[in-house]
């Protein structure tokens, strides 16, 4: 029979295991929080925010419950909060490993419907996740009712292998969803990350179950008790860090900006997807004359005018309408036969502008919003047509008239005039007769310099 620290906890290896698990959790916490702080990622109410948060919570539950249930720490007195069924059954099971795997299965479920079925999942994540967790809850309730645990929180063989089978069942479910999306040509390595997650979780479960079985069955061997619980906690710590690090969520943030192999960051989904002429306005962007009498939808095709109008709208706290127009405009540049990129862009627009609580939620009619959210084809060319019509009406009613009299339009016209003047000067200096004239010999040199400095000065 095991005795001493092997029985009551507090062996040197136990404290080493606790220290390793604490380090693992802080690494996990830093990997989940720091990227959001560095890149100033906006908080949303969508699953892309809550699922990673739940993963962090379930990881903490898993590590802390293992530490409490296998007697790693020595406590002089028996406290009510050391109740075996609280830690070894409920928190380690449904609220630990079960919740961690359920989050991953939910992500795979979303990928399946979005990229294979080409529509949003029929069940919301906040409903699907508890449904996936139900087998763990039922299993924990049965164990709690039958009370097979002894005073050391150990259960016999008749319970050990069914519990191990429940762990394996969730890995098999993840494999099933991953096989269903294996033919999709993902842009941000989601499929590879899913397979990595399966490999890591399966390997961890094999090691974990082996240590768990040895810990449960051979209670009389002291060194085996100490070694098996050390492996249990350390493997759990490694599992949660690696599992969280392999993220198939929010590709624009976690798959692009945070990859060390990337030499630069993409600020927009259009840039990440390789949409031509996407992103910030370049200073050498060609000026095209703007006629205020032209239709607004035609004027907005002028990139410089659109960005000037967008700055004005942002100053009026109504910039979401112009940002939506630009994102939809870029979405329209993707070829119709490129369904994967169209789905990425459509999903990005939905999460940014359409869903309730979005970063730049638009003031759309309920009918239009539901048409988009319940579409049966995320690749449809007219997916955002009605929403765009409503947005254009809002722009015309609330922004256009004020823009023509704003400082932003005056600045735009000044830049346009300067560009035209510089363009004409460029033609005159390109003649062979004046090509060899130096600045100091040119009687109009000072005048050219003053015009150039005034036109090129940032304003």
Swiss-Prot record:
CDD domains registered for this protein in UniProt: RGS-like_4
Organism classification: Eukaryota, Viridiplantae, Streptophyta, Embryophyta, Tracheophyta
Domain RGS: 295-413
The protein's role, per its UniProt record: Glucose-regulated GTPase-accelerating protein (GAP) for the GTP-bound self-activating heterotrimeric G alpha protein GPA1. Cooperates with G beta-gamma dimers to maintain an unactivated but fully functional pool of GPA1. Phosphorylation-dependent endocytosis of RGS1 physically uncouples the two proteins, resulting in signal activation. Free AGB1 is essential, but not sufficient, for RGS1 endocytosis. Modulates cell proliferation, abscisic acid (ABA) and drought stress signal transduction by acting in a hexokinase-independent glucose-signaling pathway.
Gene, per the UniProt record: RGS1
Bilayer topology: Multi-pass membrane protein
Membrane-spanning intervals of the chain: 9-29, 48-68, 83-103, 126-146, 157-177, 194-214, 226-246
Protein's UniProt name: Regulator of G-protein signaling 1
Ranges in coiled-coil conformation: none
């Amino acid at each position: 029979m095991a005795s001493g620290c092997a029985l009551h906890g507090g062996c040197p290896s136990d404290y080493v295991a606790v220290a390793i698990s604490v380090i693992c959790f802080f690494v996990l916490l830093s990997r989940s929080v720091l990227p959001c702080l560095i890149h100033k990622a906006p908080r949303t109410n969508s699953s892309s925010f809550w699922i990673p948060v739940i993963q962090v919570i379930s990881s903490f539950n898993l590590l802390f419950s293992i530490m409490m249930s296998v007697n790693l720490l020595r406590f002089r007195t028996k406290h009510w909060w050391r109740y075996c069924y609280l830690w070894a059954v409920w928190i380690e099971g449904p609220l630990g490993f079960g919740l961690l795997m359920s989050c991953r299965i939910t992500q795979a479920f979303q990928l399946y419907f979005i990229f294979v079925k080409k529509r949003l999942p029929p069940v919301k994540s906040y409903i699907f996740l508890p449904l996936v967790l139900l087998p763990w809850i039922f299993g924990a309730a049965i164990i709690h009712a039958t009370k097979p645990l002894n005073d050391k929180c150990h259960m016999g063989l008749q319970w050990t292998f069914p519990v191990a089978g429940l762990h394996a069942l969730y890995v098999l479910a993840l494999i099933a969803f991953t096989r269903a999306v294996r033919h999709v040509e993902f842009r941000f390595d989601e499929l590879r990350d899913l397979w990595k997650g399966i490999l890591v979780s399966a390997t961890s479960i094999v090691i974990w179950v082996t240590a768990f079985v040895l810990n449960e069955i051979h209670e009389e061997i002291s060194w085996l008790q100490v070694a098996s619980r050390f492996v249990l906690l350390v493997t759990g710590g490694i599992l949660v860090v690696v599992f969280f690090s392999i993220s198939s969520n929010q590709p624009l943030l976690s798959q692009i900006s945070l990859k060390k192999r990337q030499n630069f960051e993409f600020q927009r989904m259009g840039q990440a997807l390789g949409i031509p002429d996407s992103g910030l306005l370049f200073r050498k962007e060609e000026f095209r004359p703007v006629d205020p009498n032209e239709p607004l939808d035609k004027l907005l095709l002028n990139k410089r005018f659109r960005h000037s109008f967008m700055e004005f709208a942002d100053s009026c706290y109504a910039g979401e309408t112009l940002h939506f127009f630009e994102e939809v405009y870029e979405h329209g540049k993707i070829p119709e036969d490129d369904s994967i990129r169209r789905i990425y862009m459509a999903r990005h627009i939905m999460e940014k502008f359409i869903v309730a609580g979005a970063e730049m939620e638009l003031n759309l009619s309920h009918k239009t919003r539901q048409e988009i959210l319940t579409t049966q084809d995320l690749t449809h060319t007219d997916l955002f047509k009605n929403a765009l019509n409503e947005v254009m009406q809002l722009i015309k009613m609330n922004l256009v008239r004020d823009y023509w009299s704003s400082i932003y339009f005056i600045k735009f016209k000044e830049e346009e005039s300067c560009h035209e003047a510089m363009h004409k000067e460029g033609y005159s200096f390109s003649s062979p007769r004046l090509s060899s004239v130096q600045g100091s010999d040119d009687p109009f040199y000072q005048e050219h310099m003053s015009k150039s400095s005034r036109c090129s000065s940032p304003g």
